[in-house]
Amino acid sequence: ASRLIDYSGAVSFHRKAILVNNDSWIADQYACLSHFTGNTYRQFVLNSPQNISSGEMLVYKNTFYATSGAVTDNWNYQYNGEGIYVLKEGGWNNINRYKYAAIDSLLDFLGIAIDKRDETIWAGSYGGGLLHIKPGSQFEIYKQNKLGATMGDPTSYRVAGLAFDTDNNLWISNFGSAQPLRVMKADGSWKSFTIPFALFQNAVSQIVIDNYNYKWMVSPMGNGLLCYDHGTSIDNIFDDKWRKLGIGSGNGNLPSNDVRCIAKDKNGFMWVGTSDGVGVFQCTELLFAAQGCDAVWPVVKNGNFAGFLFKGQEVRSIAVDGADRKWVATKNGVFLISADGEKIIYEF
């Protein structure tokens, strides 16, 4: 026997269904599990993220935040609509287009940042612009007039990295636009920056701000690493300083120009993951001085042998724990590294 089930919102993208004692049980990709009996139904929603997380993760005041988005190796869209996951006091909240029609157009969330003044969420969509999530599930989307459209893709507003500085200015990587670095200042005004280097596809992604308020930016697609100091004032462009770091002594000494990630450790050192290992900047205060600052390559010891840390491996993400140890995600697994980078503690 067949049954026609028509409950608006109960089923959106069903995967499996069974009939038990004439009751229907339907597993749905977005609506979890539903039990239909007679003219009523119940939904069983799992206390979990809606899907796996591929984007950024952070913790602020015992609340965990993660973005689900990702891009292809060539920085093309994945059309991932899973959104943002928040874990607070043991309960998960999934914020995405399937739950809120107001953000239906926002896909591929990559970067995330928390405004410490009001603990609201800012998240970057790779193509859909910048999203501000306010209490009560109120949403504000920034695109035209604030962000720049992608060159060659004029309806796309790509946000690939976010970071607040100590003055509560929100720095934004506007990947692929003519001015790929933007800032929303603490007073709500905006400013955009033209990067004074030729960059393939004007690619700018992750942003990390160091102890000297310098902005470190991953420039993927083989462009290397960018550093920016706005000087005494964001509005005064005449004392701005820029550096583009890459391979070679005196030029940054990175293991590769194919930079994948950056992280700041407890000493203020900047750890840079590339497609060919790790470099560490331990002299960040000299970055814009005449002598500059080159990365050192940590040497890891394994018995009677020693080699450069993750040489020949693609380093995709680096996180620093409370003991200053480094958690490193590579294409070959996850590793826990000692604070100085000279010992592999665990491999997963």
Question: Which residues fall in each region the model found?
Answer:
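Carboxylate-rich, polar loop motifs that coordinate divalent cations or form catalytic acidic clusters
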Residues: 1-348
